[in-house]
């Protein structure tokens, strides 16, 4: 199985399955001298940990990270940084009934088509739990970016079709659902309770912003910054679409409206989302990701078994009602990983100053 590594200079390789012994990864290419310890990574992991909100699974995982290499006396050494998290609350018996059935909306059918075998326990490698390793790697990337004055944040702008106003983005991380709007939280919580009672699930939209990004990051033409960011976000299982800046709204605008006037202090507007020609322009990078509803619903569904015979399916187990809010730190991590890689690539290619 290939496709487990992201990046060219700052590289993350991940491993692990939902019901295996554990998950983890290796960061290769991180420069020496970056302040890092387990607490830095743990803070990010705690943001996506299950069981912390009304929309999340009741599976209780402490997600305690262990650094295995690449860090000494609180700083990176320039060697590969390996980390590992144990799985402790698996309940594989919940999945015995679906060993031969394909769950609609999941990767069961496609993994069987590709490999001829699959780990049906919780989705195996295709489980959302796989994103734990991305968040850990992203925490390391954020430590590198912080050294260069770059910060990444993410928050929910829509849940179940109900939008949030960007009233208090700075406080979103301390609010349920990572909401930038205190007034919408109660409506979202009510909707989650209603949908959960119906045995159904919800999708939404997450916005990611990166500030302090210098002009010049991105590698045209096939490794444009927006192309690689979209690639990274789309690699997250629940993401079905990505917008940059004005995104699809730009298709409804005139050029005179969509163009960002350039003034001595920078750009007057930011419809481009901080990227022009695949290269960062120094403005805030703005991304939005469309997150599909969790496919594990508590309703009878029509499917087939591995022999192609029709069957009915009712999914047991413990599942999220929505990937939001736990996907929010995942998308922040993926953005940070790409920016860290692009930053190192730009520094390698930069013309030496006399």
UniProtKB/Swiss-Prot annotation:
One of its GO terms (molecular function) is FMN binding. GO terms for cellular component: cytosol. NADP(+) binds at residue 48. It comes from Nitratidesulfovibrio vulgaris (strain ATCC 29579 / DSM 644 / CCUG 34227 / NCIMB 8303 / VKM B-1760 / Hildenborough) (Desulfovibrio vulgaris). NCBIfam families: aroC (TIGR00033), PRK05382.1 (NF003793). This reaction introduces a second double bond into the aromatic ring system. The lineage of its organism: Bacteria, Pseudomonadati, Thermodesulfobacteriota, Desulfovibrionia, Desulfovibrionales. InterPro entries: Chorismate_synth, Chorismate_synth_AroC_sf, Chorismate_synthase_CS. Reduced FMN (FMNH(2)). FMN binds at residues 125-127, 277, 292-296, 318. It holds the Pfam family Chorismate_synt. Its cofactor is FMNH2. This is Chorismate synthase. It catalyses: 5-O-(1-carboxyvinyl)-3-phosphoshikimate = chorismate + phosphate. Keywords: Amino-acid biosynthesis, Aromatic amino acid biosynthesis, FAD, Flavoprotein, FMN, Lyase, NADP. One of its GO terms (biological process) is chorismate biosynthetic process. Belongs to the chorismate synthase family. It comes from the Bacteria.
């Amino acid at each position: 199985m290939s496709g487990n590594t992201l990046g060219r200079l700052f590289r993350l390789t991940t491993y692990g399955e939902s019901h295996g012994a554990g998950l983890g990864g290796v960061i290769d290419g991180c420069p020496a001298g970056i302040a890092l310890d387990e607490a830095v990574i743990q803070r990010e992991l705690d943001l996506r940990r299950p069981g912390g909100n009304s929309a999340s699974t009741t599976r209780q995982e402490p997600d305690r990270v262990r650094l295995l290499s690449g860090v000494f006396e609180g700083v990176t050494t320039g060697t590969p940084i390996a980390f590992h998290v144990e799985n402790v609350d698996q309940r594989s018996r919940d999945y015995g009934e679906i060993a031969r059935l394909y769950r609609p909306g999941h990767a069961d059918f496609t993994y069987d088509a590709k490999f001829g075998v699959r780990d049906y326990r919780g989705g195996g490698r295709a489980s959302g739990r796989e994103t734990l390793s991305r968040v850990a790697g992203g925490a390391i990337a954020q430590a590198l970016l912080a050294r260069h004055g770059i910060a990444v944040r993410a928050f929910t702008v829509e849940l179940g079709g109900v939008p949030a106003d960007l009233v208090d983005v700075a406080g979103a991380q301390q609010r349920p659902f990572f909401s930038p709007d205190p007034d919408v939280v109660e409506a979202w919580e009510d909707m989650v309770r209603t949908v959960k009672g119906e045995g159904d699930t919800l999708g939404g939209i997450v916005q990611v912003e990166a500030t302090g990004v210098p002009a010049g990051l991105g590698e045209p033409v096939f490794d444009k910054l927006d192309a690689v960011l979209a690639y990274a976000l789309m690699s997250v299982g629940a993401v079905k679409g990505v917008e940059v800046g004005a995104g699809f709204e730009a298709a409804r605008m005139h050029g005179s409206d969509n163009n960002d006037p350039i003034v001595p202090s920078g750009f007057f507007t930011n419809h481009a989302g901080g990227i022009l020609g695949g290269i960062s322009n120094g403005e805030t990078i703005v991304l939005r990701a469309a997150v599909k509803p969790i496919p594990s619903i508590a309703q009878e569904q029509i499917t087939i078994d591995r022999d192609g015979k029709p069957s009915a399916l009712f999914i047991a187990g413990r599942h999220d009602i929505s990937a939001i809010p736990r996907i929010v730190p995942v998308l922040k991590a993926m953005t940070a990983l790409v920016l860290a890689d692009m930053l190192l690539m730009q520094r390698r290619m930069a013309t030496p100053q006399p």
